[in-house]
Regions:
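N-terminal intrinsically disordered/low-complexity leader segments
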Residues: 1-15, 157, 203-223
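Basic, helix-initiating cap at the start of DNA-binding domains
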Residues: 1-49, 190
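Hydrophobic/aromatic-rich alpha-helical bundle segments in the mid-to-C-terminal region
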Residues: 150-196, 211
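Hydrophobic alpha-helical connector segments
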Residues: 74-117
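HTH DNA-binding helix-turn interface
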Residues: 34-35, 48, 55-66, 71
Length: 223
């Protein structure tokens, strides 16, 4: 090992351990007690650091609680980069999500302990939901850049990458919300498949004549 790099590498590993300890402490305390019953000071104490150290790694307890979810967007984007170049953009996004669900090395949400409980809590707590939204937006910005690169376009001038990611990420979000409401931890893959099927198929189809007439009649009655 290069002696000049030894100290920075050690510092990096120590910083990673400290961040992980804070995130794990926040995760456990919030799921055990509830978000409103946990303070930043208690999280820092559980991780055996002080309040100032917490603030070097996280801006809020919500950010610390959700830190374990940040890597999932990166994994989906890594899978998206690896998809065949000739796949249509939305198909590539869907299959990247599928790759993330099935990857044995990096467990997706439904195979990680208590992630289901965390996402249920995020649906109930506005500040936690807002923090989760920021994580999703960061991942989606990277997804847009990847799709733009696949298409060979500038995402500032061509709307297709943003539309692709908005549609795919919207399907994933709808499935995640349905998963949190359903109370079935193992049901996530089915719900994600159902959401993408709806996006690719029935939502683009013309409704049957009877159904269309029924909708028109209902609208006339309400007005």
């Amino acid at each position: 090992m290069n002696p000049e790099r030894k100290t920075p590498e050690r510092r990096s590993r120590k910083a990673r351990r400290t961040r992980d300890a804070l995130a794990q402490a926040a995760f456990e305390l919030v799921l055990d007690r509830g978000l409103r019953n946990v303070t930043v000071e208690e999280i820092a104490e559980r991780a055996d650091v002080d309040r100032r150290t917490f603030s070097r790694y996280f801006t809020s307890k919500e950010a610390a609680v959700l830190d374990s979810l940040r890597g999932d967007g990166d994994r989906i984007n890594d899978a998206l980069r690896a998809r065949p170049a000739d796949e249509p953009p939305l198909t590539a996004y869907r299959r990247a999500v599928q790759d993330w669900l099935e990857a044995p090395g990096a467990q997706a949400w439904h195979r990680r302990e208590r992630i289901f409980d965390l996402l249920v809590l995020a649906e109930q707590e506005p500040t936690l939901y807002a923090a989760f939204h920021h994580i999703r937006v960061d991942a989606q910005e990277d997804s847009v850049a990847i799709v733009a690169d696949r298409l060979g376009v500038d995402p500032r001038r061509d709307i297709r990458p943003a539309v692709t990611v908005a549609a795919g990420a919207g399907a994933l979000l709808a499935a995640q919300a349905a998963w949190a409401r359903a109370g079935q931890p193992d049901d996530l893959p089915r719900l994600i498949g159902q959401a993408f099927d709806a996006l690719a198929g029935e939502l683009l189809a013309q409704p049957p004549a009877g159904q269309a007439q029924h909708s028109t009649t209902e609208g006339s009655t309400e007005s």
